[in-house]
């Protein structure tokens, strides 16, 4: 019967949608190791950084967006450079897990925006639409097993301590309104010990270690090739679905991979 046939096609199409999942890549490494630069280079080599947002197949998220909301006492400490932002408890892991699960289900998600000058979440959020590949970078991306196990590929950006410190000093002074003494005190008191205790031990979970960060084009090109193979395989699967009368995942023309809300 036509009704039964239509029902079977609908069910099959629904199953095709359920079977589809984005490729989640975790990118960890010490502070100012070049995680964002590596993600940006991957986007560039994939040709994703200069195309229309609604055609973008790759999205980038940062663990920095998921700092917990501080109490008044914690915020007062933070403004004096006395709060440890490199400790696992500084991050809202529950929200990270919830966001990643929604991304895996192909949903549009709202990402918090963190203000590093005032140490607070802004009222606005960033809208991230469904993408085929999602890069999620942060200093402690692999610390929580629950989060770590969600990634199909794990990268660790390995940069020497002197380079990371010099980059952090320049960044925090120019972008975050800190003075040199505060940056150095925070590094010695919190950043360096936290790296050695919480971040560095997670290096063992990485599938690929990238020395020298974005300067290591050999490693990045290998990763890009792997992502391209995934994207091409996904495209073939969706095209086959169309040929068989199934409906692939669609994105509204007005949707972008990431934009302010």
From Swiss-Prot:
Organism the protein comes from: Danio rerio
Binding site for substrate: 86, 114, 119, 168, 178, 186
UniProt function note: Phosphorylates uridine and cytidine to uridine monophosphate and cytidine monophosphate. Does not phosphorylate deoxyribonucleosides or purine ribonucleosides. Can use ATP or GTP as a phosphate donor.
Database matches in Gene3D superfamilies: P-loop containing nucleotide triphosphate hydrolases
Keyword Metal-binding listed: no
Gene Ontology molecular function: ATP binding; cytidine kinase activity; uridine kinase activity
Assembly description: Homotetramer.
Domain of life: Eukaryota
UniProt record similarity statement: Belongs to the uridine kinase family.
The protein, known as: Uridine-cytidine kinase 2-A
Catalysed reaction equations from the record: uridine + ATP = UMP + ADP + H(+); cytidine + ATP = CMP + ADP + H(+)
GO terms of biological process kind: CTP salvage; UMP salvage
Keyword list, A-Z: ATP-binding, Kinase, Nucleotide-binding, Transferase
Record bears the keyword Kinase: yes
Enzyme Commission numbers on file: 2.7.1.48
Pathway this chain belongs to: Pyrimidine metabolism; CTP biosynthesis via salvage pathway; CTP from cytidine: step 1/3; Pyrimidine metabolism; UMP biosynthesis via salvage pathway; UMP from uridine: step 1/1
GO cellular component, one term: cytoplasm
Stored InterPro entries: P-loop_NTPase, PRK/URK, Uridine_kinase-like
């Amino acid at each position: 019967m036509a009704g039964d046939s239509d029902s079977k096609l609908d069910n099959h199409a629904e199953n095709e949608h359920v079977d589809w999942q984005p490729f989640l890549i975790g990118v960890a490494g010490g502070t100012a190791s070049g995680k964002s630069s590596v993600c940006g280079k991957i986007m560039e080599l994939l040709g994703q950084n200069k195309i229309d947002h609604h055609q973008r197949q790759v999205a980038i998220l940062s663990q920095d967006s998921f700092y917990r909301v501080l109490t008044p006492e914690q915020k007062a400490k933070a403004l004096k450079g006395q709060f440890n932002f490199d400790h696992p408890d500084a991050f809202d892991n529950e929200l990270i897990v919830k966001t990643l699960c929604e991304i895996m289900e192909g949903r549009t998600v709202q990402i918090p925006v963190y203000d590093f000058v005032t140490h607070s979440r802004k009222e606005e959020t960033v809208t991230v639409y469904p993408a085929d590949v999602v890069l999620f970078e942060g200093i402690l991306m692999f610390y929580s097993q629950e989060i770590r196990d969600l990634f199909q590929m794990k990268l660790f950006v390995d940069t020497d301590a002197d380079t990371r410190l010099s980059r952090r000093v320049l960044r925090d002074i120019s972008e975050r309104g800190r003075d040199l003494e505060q940056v150095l005190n925070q590094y010695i008191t919190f950043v360096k010990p936290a790296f050695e205790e919480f971040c560095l031990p997670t290096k063992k979970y990485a599938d690929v270690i990238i020395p020298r960060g974005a300067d290591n084009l050999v490693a990045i090109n290998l990763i890009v090739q792997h992502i391209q193979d995934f994207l091409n395989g996904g495209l073939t699967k969706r095209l086959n679905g169309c040929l068989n009368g199934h409906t692939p995942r669609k994105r509204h023309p007005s949707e972008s991979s990431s934009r302010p809300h």
